[in-house]
Design a protein with these regions (language model features):
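Positively charged n-region of N-terminal signal peptides that target proteins for export
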Residues: 1-7, 11
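C-terminal motif of bacterial Sec signal peptides marking the signal peptidase cleavage site
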Residues: 16-20
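Exported/periplasmic ABC-transporter solute-binding proteins
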Residues: 4, 22-309
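N-terminal leader and targeting sequences that precede the mature domain
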Residues: 9, 21-22
Length: 309
């Protein structure tokens, strides 16, 4: 462009000189002015080129900075699985730092939407309004939701209908389901929990549960049930310890195999949440690709869940 503009200016100077031979000082001034205009045009073009270069540099600067850290935020039920994957990833990549903030599914989804973490963690599928915000889900694994009681409790099997009646207050005493004469103490998770969302949607008890306590983490639910012989709760199968007893549901024991073949019906997905149009850093993208590959399946299985891939 610069060269083209210069050629046009020189042609104009030549035409003026031919038309004004012997015309005196006035035409000489015109030629000088045209020469000056050529210089001015060149300067302006240089500035335009520089501006274009600056603009290009600004676009490049918008690519996310990679500081070697992968930050995740969300589901407490995913702690065992995501922790194992994070440790494995760091072991294979020197200098990389992996962080996990166990805030709950709802908070993790919000953190991604607001750009406060690389990857959100949810133990439920995204809702329509969350997808409308430009959020995207990728299923990492599947996890059973275990129905847990105190080890001293004689009850060992409940069907989905009975579980629903217990949590909605239709059944209030353990003797009505084969246990001792004692009031059933209902333990659950807080609103916004992916585990609660999964449990209530499967049992058909949304907004109907009469919780005695609504706790903020999987670990708190397990600890509370372990300490109260009359309590019942629900928790990620991957996190269940021998301090509580997981009852069978409709005669099916919750295991990796029964979750995988779907015979254990109280189960939900473990989801990675990202934002459409927001590029992950190279390190975060490498982590995402790793955990969703077949290479991670064994680690996920050892953590008690069933890999989606």
């Amino acid at each position: 462009m610069k060269r083209k503009l210069s050629i046009l200016v020189l042609a104009a100077v030549g035409a003026a000189m031919l038309a004004g031979c012997g015309a005196g000082t006035a035409n000489g001034s015109t030629a000088a002015d045209n020469a000056a205009n050529e210089s001015t045009t060149d300067v302006a073009t240089d500035k335009a080129d520089a501006s274009a270069t600056d603009s290009s540099e600004n676009v490049t600067a918008e690519v996310p900075e990679d500081n070697g850290t992968v930050s995740t935020d969300g589901s407490t039920s995913m702690e065992k699985v995501i922790g194992a994957l994070g440790e494995s990833f760091m072991a294979q990549n020197d200098g990389v730092t992996f962080t996990y903030n166990p805030t709950g599914s709802g908070s993790g989804i919000t953190a991604v939407a607001e750009g406060r973490c690389d990857i959100g963690l949810s133990s439920r599928n995204l809702k329509d309004d969350e997808v409308a915000q430009g959020l995207k889900q990728t299923v990492l694994a599947y996890d059973g939701i275990a129905i847990i009681v105190n080890p001293e409790n004689e009850v060992s099997d409940l069907d989905v209908e009975t579980i629903a009646k217990i949590y909605t207050g239709e059944i209030t005493n353990w003797k009505d389901v084969g246990g001792k004469d004692a009031e059933i103490v209902l333990i659950g998770r807080e609103a916004g929990s992916g585990t609660r969302d999964g449990f209530e949607s499967i049992t058909g008890t949304e907004d109907k549960c009469l919780y005695r306590q609504e706790l903020t983490s999987t670990g708190d639910v397990i600890t509370t049930v372990a300490q109260n012989p009359d309590a019942i709760g629900y928790a990620s199968l991957a996190s269940v310890k021998d301090t509580v007893k997981a009852v069978s549901v409709g005669g099916v024991v919750p295991t990796e195999e029964t979750v995988k073949d779907a015979s254990y019906v109280i189960q939900r997905p473990f989801v990675l949440v990202t934002k459409e149009g927001t590029e992950l850093t190279p390190t975060a993208q490498k982590f995402f690709d790793y955990v969703t590959s077949a290479d991670a399946a064994e680690i996920i299985a050892k953590a008690g869940a069933v890999a989606a891939n």
